[in-house]
Amino acid sequence: MHYPEPISKLIDSFMKLPGIGPKTAQRLAFHTLDMKEDDVVQFAKALVDVKRELTYCSVCGHITENDPCYICEDKQRDRSVICVVEDDKDVIAMEKMREYKGLYHVLHGSISPMDGIGPEDINIPSLIERLKSDEVSELILAMNPNLEGESTAMYISRLVKPIGIKVTRLAQGLSVGGDLEYADEVTLSKAITGRTEM
């Protein structure tokens, strides 16, 4: 079907979002058309503001309005422990449980040779530099329990062991193939408490 150009552009834009196919994009585009103009302007401004006003922390890689982020700035945090996660949503999931008091390092992905993503394509080099300069005694690898997460954890473990830092992995209890961000607080709490050395 042929749509007016503004609708086609909007449908194409919505389809760039993960999990949004042509039918959902079409539904969202027509819903946007039915919205009040003020609401559409506010929505568009929120999209632009996310890109303009947020950055990544130069220390840990987490999204932030201020650099360094509030977690890295918090002097009450245990600076001897760093929890390595795949993305920002994992930090948010870990923070919800209110038990972990260390720092984070966000990789922004995982090693996936099938997708052409190698160690140099994610935030691993800055992690290694950070471990050499900070006084870290333990590195918790909190990758998602899937093939890519396991590969990433093994790769980091092999890199870090020679530095002499204890490397642990979250306890299993997380579903294999699942994502950390979808785990409930109790499961995450048990996984961090029961972590195992690699």
UniProtKB/Swiss-Prot annotation:
**Zinc fingers (C4-type): which spans?**
57-72
Is Zinc-finger one of the keywords UniProt gives this record?
Answer: yes
Give a yes or no for keyword rRNA processing in this entry.
Answer: no
Single GO molecular-function term? zinc ion binding
Write out the GO biological process terms: DNA recombination; DNA repair
Its domain of life reads: Bacteria
Q: Where is the Toprim domain?
A: 80-175
Q: Which positions carry the signal peptide feature in this UniProt record?
A: none
Q: Which UniProt keywords apply?
A: DNA damage, DNA recombination, DNA repair, Metal-binding, Zinc, Zinc-finger
> Per its database record, what is this protein's job?
May play a role in DNA repair. It seems to be involved in an RecBC-independent recombinational process of DNA repair. It may act with RecF and RecO.
Q: Which family does it belong to?
A: Belongs to the RecR family.
What protein am I looking at? Answer: Recombination protein RecR
Lineage here is: Bacteria, Bacillati, Bacillota, Bacilli, Bacillales
Gene name of the record:
recR
